[in-house]
Amino acid sequence: MTKSELIERLASQQSHIPAKAVEDAVKEMLEHMASTLAQGERIEIRGFGSFSLHYRAPRTGRNPKTGDKVELEGKYVPHFKPGKELRDRANIYEG
């Protein structure tokens, strides 16, 4: 599901709310989550999961074109850990 699909689905389920208001709310929520992570804070949505930053240590990588070694700096990357309820619901899916 893309962000646009999420907005469309929410707008159709909440027909009393204008689609633009739904779009603005989704964008504002995602922006707030991104800025919270950028400040190094953890986000927990009970029953769904938590978002946090994990540190990736500096390492030696390779340039895929040339094969040359490249030193990569350490960095923080977003990490999502699903909650138990989400894990349980995902295990029902049989593709």
Swiss-Prot record:
Name the Pfam families on file: Bac_DNA_binding
Q: Which GO terms describe its molecular function?
A: DNA binding; structural constituent of chromatin
Function description: This protein is one of the two subunits of integration host factor, a specific DNA-binding protein that functions in genetic recombination as well as in transcriptional and translational control.
Q: What is the lineage of its organism?
A: Bacteria, Pseudomonadati, Pseudomonadota, Gammaproteobacteria, Enterobacterales
Cite a single GO BP annotation: DNA recombination
> Sorted alphabetically, which PROSITE patterns does this protein's record hold?
HISTONE_LIKE (PS00045)
Similarity remark: Belongs to the bacterial histone-like protein family.
Question: Which organism does this record belong to?
Answer: Klebsiella pneumoniae subsp. pneumoniae (strain ATCC 700721 / MGH 78578)
Reply yes or no: does the keyword Acyltransferase apply.
no
Domain of life per record: Bacteria
- Presence of the UniProt keyword DNA-binding in the record: yes
* Subunit description: Heterodimer of an alpha and a beta chain.
Q: Where is the signal peptide?
A: none
Protein name in UniProt? Integration host factor subunit beta
Please give the InterPro entries that the UniProt record associates with this protein: Hist_DNA-bd, Histone-like_DNA-bd_CS, IHF-like_DNA-bd_dom_sf, IHF_beta
Swiss-Prot/TrEMBL keywords: DNA recombination, DNA-binding, Transcription, Transcription regulation, Translation regulation
Q: Name one GO cellular component term.
A: cytosol
